[in-house]
């Protein structure tokens, strides 16, 4: 018989690095979840932009079960068919010629930064080690990636941090230009800053970074962990901007809920990563790559990408209507189905409170800092689910505006 558990057990048994919601989801289908008490929620959080096809998608369940009935894991001393097939699909769909599989976005970014440093050291010299990143970015929680992230809140307790990482202002080409020089080995940037407030880059900014990297022989890394796999209405956001990076990192939606990450690059850059220079025990395991292959088959279609753009318009229209009613947001921004509602000054710092009230009303949303409510729903969310979820979100806004919301 299974052990009966409650939310209170989290506080008793788990390392307290999270403060989970007061309810425990136990079942999901599409864009709906149900908790232990049977309450239904519309899911606009998507596991933080992970559940690109919603919960328990039948094609993903079939792919997982089919591979689970064969074998689960062999380690990196062997390759496997699902990993090779997924690598070829990613290569055919993008600029890439080589793929490295891992288990998360942080691992993918770690691999990208290590590759950039090694390439510069091998081809130029050890002095070419500088990394330019951006303030309020998020690239993961390893010591290297959290240092690149440019949010002291996440890194200040773990000094000394890796050296030679400097941070420019996002969407400010002059700020970046002042830091990028011949000793720079890489520039890492999110096409849309997700955790930093759902801020899309301007095309001129990314084009300018491309030109600066070319001028100084630095590698341009696009962190597409949150924007990738259809989230923005293109398979990857670099396609939306028409700016091609040297390295692209992807994770989250790639597995549709099954942990996987990948670093994509060209043959020339990949060639410096010789046997033993990097690795991972679980990366590219057949369960993850079988599921991810099916995710890519479904999402990498004109129908799906057109659908994301249409759903973007539906969200924006309804959010604008809601904002006319409540006047809570100073800006509604984002690309595709990665959207952020910036709170007016009078509601500053209350994004988490709105998210808590939304959950009480039966809709799950995210935050991106204290002042931005973030939406990252499934790419196949239905019109009815959008309408129902935003009606529930309106109840949370109404409660907050009336002053009846409280933390907890």
UniProtKB/Swiss-Prot annotation:
Presence of the UniProt keyword Transferase in the record? yes
Q: In which pathway does it act?
A: Amino-acid degradation; L-arginine degradation via AST pathway; L-glutamate and succinate from L-arginine: step 3/5
**What is this enzyme's catalytic activity, as reactions?**
N(2)-succinyl-L-ornithine + 2-oxoglutarate = N-succinyl-L-glutamate 5-semialdehyde + L-glutamate
What EC number is given for this enzyme?
A: 2.6.1.81
A biological process from GO: alpha-amino acid biosynthetic process
InterPro entries, sorted: Ac/SucOrn_transaminase_bac (IPR017652), AcOrn/SuccOrn_fam (IPR004636), Aminotrans_3 (IPR005814), Aminotrans_3_PPA_site (IPR049704), Class-III_PLP-dep_AT (IPR050103), PyrdxlP-dep_Trfase (IPR015424), PyrdxlP-dep_Trfase_major (IPR015421), PyrdxlP-dep_Trfase_small (IPR015422)
SUPFAM superfamilies on file = PLP-dependent transferases
> Which Pfam families does UniProt cross-reference here?
Aminotran_3
Molecular function, one GO term: succinylornithine transaminase activity
Q: Which cofactor does it need?
A: pyridoxal 5'-phosphate
N6-(pyridoxal phosphate)lysine occurs at 252
Q: Give the UniProt keywords, A-Z.
A: Aminotransferase, Arginine metabolism, Pyridoxal phosphate, Transferase
* Enzyme class, UniProt record, top EC level: transferase
What is this protein for, i.e. what is its function? Catalyzes the transamination of N(2)-succinylornithine and alpha-ketoglutarate into N(2)-succinylglutamate semialdehyde and glutamate. Can also act as an acetylornithine aminotransferase.
The similarity comment for this entry is: Belongs to the class-III pyridoxal-phosphate-dependent aminotransferase family. AstC subfamily.
User: What is the protein's given name?
Assistant: Succinylornithine transaminase
